[in-house]
Amino acid sequence: MTDFGRVITAMITPFTADGAIAYDVAAKLAQHLVANGSDGIVVCGTTGESPTLTWEEEFQLFQTVQQAVAGKAKIIAGTGSNSTREAIDATAKAAELGLDGALLVVPYYNKPPQEGLYAHFQAIAKAVPDFPLMLYNIPGRTGQNLLPETVIRLAEYPNIVAIKEASGSLDQASTLRAALPPTFRIYAGDDSLTLPLLAVGGYGVVSVASHLVGLRIQEMIQAFVQGDTAKATAIHCQLLPLFKALFVTTNPIPIKAALSLQGWSVGEPRLPLTSASDAVISQLKAVLDDLGLLKS
């Protein structure tokens, strides 16, 4: 059974001042994440600015992070695309490179019907039958909701082992949990819904906030799993202002700004994303300071 772990960080992609990928910083950041609560890392997902990376950059980044982590965490490649052919090729490459799995976003912009979504993921699963795959449902970005009945059909493929459920619907996650075996893992796609999702049968989170508070998120999940719901709730409430602050504008703008405030040289997002505004930076400073996450 594939286990990607409870806390998976959707890692940012650091850039140099001239906009090239800072592979050395990526390696250091990956090591830092694994030492601070991350069981797995998604490389080149939404938070990693995959739409503005070339496939060549992505493949090099996969290898950089894989080598840096050296088996201490699961490395999951963001290989989704709104072109089925491209998604198959990229996922096959990730498998060839020896990564631990792939995160496959629902095809965006072209808005396939449910049967098209089924055929898309089916084709990828058949192309890499021994490679673990995590579906990624985020209708707010893709324009299309991967419905539970489609996920249930796809889960019949043994290498489709999990879903990052970022629809924001606990009812949708509950429907999946009721219909699928516990070996099919449901991950929160929003930090603020990690604890609520656990309550309806979720397994963990693909997190942005874990760049900053991975150990606390891990502690929250473990408290819930061990039956200490009061402790889990207390941690959730303590971290909620951070969870919300990291999404006051488009991800990954706030998390990159927060990491910069902590001293990481992660650079600015690539266009069409922009730098954090003064107002966003001010809000982040206040929240980070309240949680003791800024160096004095």
Swiss-Prot record:
UniProt-listed InterPro entries: Aldolase_TIM (IPR013785), DapA (IPR005263), DapA-like (IPR002220), Schiff_base-form_aldolases_AS (IPR020625), Schiff_base-form_aldolases_CS (IPR020624)
Pathway noted in the entry: Amino-acid biosynthesis; L-lysine biosynthesis via DAP pathway; (S)-tetrahydrodipicolinate from L-aspartate: step 3/4
Keywords linked to the UniProt accession: Amino-acid biosynthesis, Cytoplasm, Diaminopimelate biosynthesis, Lyase, Lysine biosynthesis, Schiff base
Protein name from the UniProt record: 4-hydroxy-tetrahydrodipicolinate synthase
Assigned protein family: Belongs to the DapA family.
Protein function: Catalyzes the condensation of (S)-aspartate-beta-semialdehyde [(S)-ASA] and pyruvate to 4-hydroxy-tetrahydrodipicolinate (HTPA).
Subcellular localization: Cytoplasm
Organism for this UniProt entry: Thermosynechococcus vestitus (strain NIES-2133 / IAM M-273 / BP-1)
EC number per UniProt: 4.3.3.7
Subunit structure: Homotetramer; dimer of dimers.
Domain of life: Bacteria
Site (Part of a proton relay during catalysis): T46, Y109
